[in-house]
A protein has these predicted regions:
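Short acidic-aromatic low-complexity motifs
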Residues: 2-40
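A beta-strand edge to alpha-helix "cap/lid" segment located at domain peripheries
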Residues: 2-8, 66-162
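A structural signal for well-ordered alpha-helical scaffolds and beta->alpha junctions
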Residues: 9, 27, 55-58, 105
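Hydrophobic alpha-helical core bundles mediating ligand binding, dimerization, or RNAP-core interactions
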Residues: 13-20, 38, 58, 62-65, ...
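Short N-terminal signal/transit or membrane-insertion segments
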Residues: 17, 43-52, 150-160
Length: 162
C-alpha cells in the first residue's frame, strides 16, 4: 500500500526521529517520545528489556533503560515505509572512533506500526546484543555512572497487538 497513509507514516516517523535527536542532545527525557508518538496501548519490544505494554510502561522503560548511555547516539541509516509499516536501519553508536577512523557502532533495526494521528502502536527493536557488547569492549567504553539493568527474564514475545 502506498499513498497518503505511507506519506503520513513517513512524516510521523521523521518527527519521531527529530525528537529523538533532541533527547540525545539532552534537551528532553526519553519518555518525551511517548506522549507525542505512541498510542495509549502501544507495545514496545526491546531485545534486552523485553516487551513493554502501554504508554506509561514504555515511558518508564525508556527512561530506565537509557540510564548510563547518555553519550551514545542512534543515527538513522535508512527508513522504508509501506502503508502503516515502517522499517528503519540505525546504529547504536558509542563515543570515539576506531584507529581507522570508523565509529564504534553496531546496527539495529526497528519495525513500527503506524496507527494514525501521528502515533505508533507497535515498535520492535532488533539488534545483536553480543555485537553491542563486543563494540563496547573494543571501544573501552564504560558508563560514567549508574546504568539501567534489564530484567533477568524479560517477556520476549514480539507478537504485534491485534
Amino acid at each position: 500500500m502506498t499513498g497518503d497513509r505511507s506519506d503520513e507514516a513517513r512524516e510521523a516517523y521523521g518527527r519521531l526521529v527529530a525528537r529523538r535527536e533532541r533527547v540525545q542532545a539532552g534537551e528532553v527525557p526519553w519518555s518525551a517520545l511517548c506522549d507525542e508518538f505512541f498510542t495509549d496501548d502501544v507495545v514496545f519490544i526491546d531485545p534486552a528489556w523485553g516487551r513493554n505494554e502501554g504508554r506509561a510502561a514504555v515511558a518508564d522503560f525508556m527512561d530506565r533503560s537509557m540510564v548510563g548511555l547518555e553519550d551514545w547516539t542512534f543515527p538513522e541509516e535508512w527508513t522504508m515505509v509501506d502503508g502503516d509499516r515502517v522499517v528503519s536501519f540505525w546504529w547504536n553508536r558509542l563515543p570515539g572512533t576506531r584507529p581507522d577512523g570508523r565509529p564504534y557502532q553496531a546496527p539495529g533495526i526497528s519495525i513500527l506500526h503506524y496507527a494514525g494521528d501521528g502515533r505508533f502502536s507497535y515498535e520492535c527493536d532488533l539488534l545483536n546484543m553480543a555485537e553491542v557488547f563486543e563494540v563496547m569492549k573494543d571501544s573501552g567504553w564504560a558508563p560514567a555512572g549508574p546504568v539501567g539493568i534489564p530484567p533477568k527474564r524479560p517477556d520476549r514475545d514480539i507478537t504485534p497487538p491485534r
